């Protein structure tokens, strides 16, 4: 089942522009991942492969800050704080997952097991389920 753009904006709490930025980052990441796995670019590290995701997170955080400040100035204080809290929580959990996965791939450490790496995603899924129930 596919979701409409309106439903995605409602459930994720991101603006359409932010979703576009993250999809563009996913496209660039996919190309870099294919280049890294095939070995076509010898000096490409895992940290360089994940740069599009890190950049998208940074741009999304910047955009969210601007939107929250504008909402706060317009008198929508409650909406501004809730939006800022929600988006920063989602981006923080996503960022922690990306950092842990990148560290595991780059260093092959035994201390990082995949249950620990994916735990931010499980927390994020629980939060999205709660938000989906609240929205509908």
Curated annotation (Swiss-Prot):
Where it sits in the cell: the answer is: Endoplasmic reticulum membrane; Endoplasmic reticulum-Golgi intermediate compartment; Lysosome membrane
Start and end residues of each stretch annotated as Interaction with STING1? 1-51
Presence of keyword Endoplasmic reticulum: yes
Q: In which tissues is it expressed?
A: Increased expression seen in T-lymphocytes from patients with systemic lupus erythematosus (SLE).
User: GO BP, one example?
Assistant: intracellular calcium ion homeostasis
> Where is the major localization of this protein?
endoplasmic reticulum
Cellular component terms (Gene Ontology):
endoplasmic reticulum; endoplasmic reticulum membrane; endoplasmic reticulum-Golgi intermediate compartment; lysosomal membrane
**Keywords of this protein's UniProt record, alphabetized?**
Endoplasmic reticulum, Lysosome, Membrane, Transmembrane, Transmembrane helix
User: Which residues lie within the region annotated Required for the lysosomal localization of the STING-TMEM203 complex?
Assistant: 52-136
Tell me the InterPro entries matching this sequence: TM_Fragile-X-F-assoc
| Membrane-related topology note | Multi-pass membrane protein
Superkingdom per UniProt: Eukaryota
Where are its TM segments located? Answer: 14-34, 50-72, 81-101, 112-132
- Role description: Involved in the regulation of cellular calcium homeotasis. Required for spermatogenesis. Acts as a regulator of STING-mediated inflammatory signaling in macrophages. Forms a complex with STING, promoting the activity of TBK1 kinase and the transcription factor IRF3, leading to activation of type I interferon expression.
- Record's subunit section: Homodimer. Interacts with ATP2A2, ITPR3 and STIM1. Interacts with STING1 (via transmembrane domain).
Protein name listed in UniProt: Transmembrane protein 203
Which gene is transcribed and translated to give this protein?
Answer: TMEM203
